[in-house]
Structures are given as structure tokens and as C-alpha cells.
């Protein structure tokens, strides 16, 4: 239980946002296989808690980006909206047609779920 709490505290203290949470799979003849195992229902509960905290941290991070500038690599354009990622791998959309592969400087103006909205500066 303490190791789980420590993991949760690390996520909070370090403001981690891109988490890859998955249950451990026992492998025969490994030191971990000989350790006491956590029941599956507890594993699922802990994974859910960690994912929720990661999502909360991500929403807070994205909210804090509003008003900041970013560098965006345009990955695709759909119906005059350019989509890409920032230098920090956050999703950004700009309501303008920008050539795929272009790198543009933009200002973050809003967010919706996990996508930041921006305009070119």
C-alpha cells in the first residue's frame, strides 16, 4: 500500500502528465514472481486512481498553457483547421490552413478536453 501511495505522490509532486499505467504481469523465475502479489481488484482500482490523477494533472497543465506561446508542427489539415503538436507534445489546433509539415509559432487561447486552441503569431 505504501509503495502505491509513494507512486501517487510522485505523480503529484512531479506534475507528471503523460502516464502509461498498466498492470504488472508475473513472469516465472523472476524475483518479482516470488514477492507477495496484489489482488486483481486492488490492481484495477489503483490503476484507475493513477490514471485519474494523470488526467487531472494533464488538464491543469493544459489550462496553464493558455496565454503562452508555443511552437507547433502541423500534422494535418481538415476543413481549414490545422492540427499538430507543440514542442511539449500537446495537441494544438489553429483555425487556418497551414501546410502540413510547417512549423509555426502560435499563442494558446483556449482548450477543449485535451486539445489547445491557438492562433499564429
What are these regions, as identified by a protein language model?
Residues 1-30, 49, 53-56:
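Conserved C-terminal portion of the radical SAM core fold
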Residues 25-26, 33-121:
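Terminal RNA-binding accessory module
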Amino acid at each position: 500500500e505504501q509503495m502505491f501511495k509513494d507512486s501517487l505522490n510522485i505523480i503529484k509532486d512531479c506534475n507528471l502528465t503523460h502516464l502509461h499505467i498498466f498492470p504488472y504481469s508475473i513472469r516465472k523465475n523472476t524475483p518479482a514472481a516470488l514477492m507477495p502479489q496484489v489482488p486483481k481488484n486492488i490492481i484495477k482500482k489503483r490503476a484507475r486512481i493513477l490514471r485519474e490523477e494523470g488526467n487531472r494533472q494533464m488538464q491543469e497543465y493544459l489550462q496553464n498553457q493558455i496565454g503562452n506561446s508555443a511552437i507547433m508542427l502541423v500534422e494535418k489539415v481538415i476543413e481549414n483547421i490545422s492540427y499538430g503538436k507543440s514542442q511539449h507534445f500537446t495537441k494544438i489546433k489553429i483555425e487556418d490552413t497551414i501546410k502540413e509539415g510547417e512549423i509555426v509559432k502560435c499563442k494558446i487561447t483556449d482548450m477543449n478536453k485535451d486539445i489547445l486552441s491557438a492562433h499564429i503569431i
